[in-house]
Amino acid sequence: MRFRFTWRRESDSAAVSAHETGALTSRSESTRALVLALEAFEREPTNADALREAVEQCNRLRDFGQAHDLLLTATEIQPWLVATLVADTYLAAGDFEHELAARREASEANPGRGDLKFKLIRARIRAGQLDEARQEITRLELAHPAAAAWMLRIDLLNAEQRRGDALLAAIDAFEEAPDEVRRYRLLLRQALTCLRKDGDPMAARKAHEILDELGEDRLGDPLSVILAIRVAVAVGREETVRALIDLLPSDTEQKEVLRTRAWLAHRDGDLGQARKIWRHLGNHSPMPSQRVCGAEELERRDGNLLPPAGDEIRLYTVVRNELWRLQWFVSYYRKLGVDRFFFVDNDSSDGSLAWLLEQPDVHVFHAGGSYAEAASGTVWLNQLVREHSPSGWQLYVDVDEALVFADIENHGLRGLTEYMERKGHDLAAGQMVDMFSMEAHQPSDDRFEDDFVSRYPFFSHEFERTQSVVCPYFFTVGGIRQLAGFGENNTKTPLARGGREIQYLSSSHMVTPGVVSDVGVALLHYKLVGDFLADFRRDVAENHRVSHCTRRYEAYIEFFETWGGDLSQIYPASVDRYSSSRSLLDHGLVTPLPEDFRTHAE
């Protein structure tokens, strides 16, 4: 079936409304922009531009239901365009499977349009259909030589975890046409990707080269300036960041620019200004984890007395079918000094809920909703922390994580919190350290694993860090899972002071601003334990995680299946055996305790 289509604006009134909403969005007035866009489409329901603007505003606010309703009513708009906007909405929601179906529908309706084919191939890459994408890239190059297939080949290399090759391809593409802005932007993005996900020395050298050669021709493009700022942050060139950000209008409110201004305020010691900027971002351009938690989302199940927070150390976490870990987990943190536990149980069916309800120091909240829609449970935990930790200390760890810092065996958590309180520190940060065994282990007959630390004693000590504009201000990659090539951020901020406006933005990988302690911590990470391959397969099959997490688990399965789950076959040279916190200290994975920490403790 053939569809007629045009990108021409159909009236001046729609053009004015689109201009107004664009200006408002640049000031982060997203709600008002949405109202204007909806009014414009209501006036002209046959106007494709008005529909597009309204859907884009809905997606910016993550109001996907309203976007869907709008598209259902757009019966007088070209079907291929509606399909494209449906795909854009699925993409904004992170639903790559349905995005792909909608892109296919739009492209099949207009087989002669190279731009729609381009978007379809990108959707295939996002959905993991890499072989199909590779074949279609070749066909696209033949049918549409000007379609910039080199961009798709770089996307494909990244999806195959071949980021170094993608950087080389980006360099080649840039050198072919150095005056082309999109090639320059892509080179900046790829250098940043390699820096963050791999700590790649070649990417670092290229980043410095790019920054050293910035000229007037590059500085006139705001997006290139913003990308250059991100690269400069990653390689620690603060003065370059300051020089570049001064080139942008002072009232620029693009998200990355605001985050950078908050980072610079932190660097200048102005925590109040950093927090003010992040409050503004949270009010106008919130991350999914910052949405309001509905009253119906959490239902308290325990009957234990819940006193005021006082100076308690309170632990918060989410569980789903983790019975075999719970006894060890709760025991470990009780010994460290946790006073009270807050568990969100996300529909466990293995007895986890019953076991938790038997514990006198545990409070249990049931969440029957989607873990993914709650931003990996972060929405729930932010709500509980707001309600139950207005003072004292909050510890956010997963049930496969064991907190460690230098000499923790002698000081416990209370020794750390007392030091942090005396110093005015809000946060303790560090990284996950993947632990594993050289032989398979299964839980004992009573269904509990009682000692992860001794059963899974090995770890890889190779890690790389780059700077970040989001607290705790660094991005960490490394550990044995890095061999799978996914480049996961291992940074964690497990300990925070209550009542200090700390919000979790991406689990505890990123948080809102606070004073980060000079005591660096680590989390022993027991993910590669038990029959972890079966756990990963079940996790993917249940599909309760956000899309990028599901893809990461798929990458783990593909990599570790190569070795049959036998980690002794991998054994990188950087492996050591954990015996105490000293094992991490020797490799720089935790920091030495400051002298006045010891003096105070004594």
Task: Indicate residue ranges for each PLM-predicted region.
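Register position in tetratricopeptide repeats
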Residues: 26, 60, 92, 126, ...
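Short coil turns that delineate tetratricopeptide repeat
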Residues: 45, 77-79, 111, 144-145, ...
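N-proximal low-complexity "stem/linker" segments adjacent to membrane-targeting elements
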Residues: 279, 283-327
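Start-of-helix register in tetratricopeptide repeats
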Residues: 15, 49, 81-84, 115, ...
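Active-site-proximal specificity loops/subdomain of glycosyltransferases
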Residues: 353-396, 404-409
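Catalytic-site signature of metal-activated, phosphate-bearing donor transferases
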Residues: 377, 405-602
